[in-house]
Amino acid sequence: MSISLLGRIVSQQFSGIRAAGPGRSLYLPFTLLLKQPGAYKVTLHRYVHSTQTKSHLSFLMNNNDITPFQKFTVKVLKEQCKSRGLKLSGRKSDLLQRLITHDSCSNKKSSVKINEPKKKRILINDPIKITKKLVSDKTFRTIEKNISSLQNTPVIETPCDVHSHLQPRDRIFLLGFFMLSCLWWNLEPQESKPTIDH
């Protein structure tokens, strides 16, 4: 019998005591039961359908027992699959298998520790002691590294870099082009002048 049902039965049998307040009235149905001598022997029974399965299920999951899973209904198994983000369709055996594999994988993942590299803190306020010898060695080392890296890089030469001076054939071509342009320029004004016949 649930508590709400018990409250209804008691309120029907007893009218209750009226608790008076300023402009308010409240009936307390259980106060008469407390004043009766046999009222302390009231027992309540909770049936299986009214218990919460989530607390039991989490206890069973922690113990990794497979057999108690089979006692749950398909509806409860689907709720558990939904809470874990698993597929909801299938038979009861499929749901059981998904829950068992998911829990075994999650237990393995929680047991494996991920070692993250510790971040080094750089304190800006602390002065750094550098000797002149260290600075001079460092500059020579960096210069040597730069020179060696420049020597190792491939040199890409453009045609202008390869042939920076004019070849004799280029000189002949440019001289000929210049002379033809001058001749053509001199011939053009003579053709455009009107001829006067006397």
UniProtKB/Swiss-Prot annotation:
It comes from the Eukaryota. SUPFAM superfamilies: SAP domain. Residues 1-55 form a transit peptide. Residues 69-103 form the SAP domain. It is found in: Mitochondrion membrane. The keyword Metal-binding does not apply. GO terms for cellular component: mitochondrial membrane. It is a single-pass membrane protein. The chain crosses the membrane at residues 172-187. Gene3D superfamilies: SAP domain. Its main location: mitochondrion. Keywords: Membrane, Mitochondrion, Transit peptide, Transmembrane, Transmembrane helix. Belongs to the AIM34 family. This is Altered inheritance of mitochondria protein 34, mitochondrial. It comes from Saccharomyces cerevisiae (strain Lalvin EC1118 / Prise de mousse).
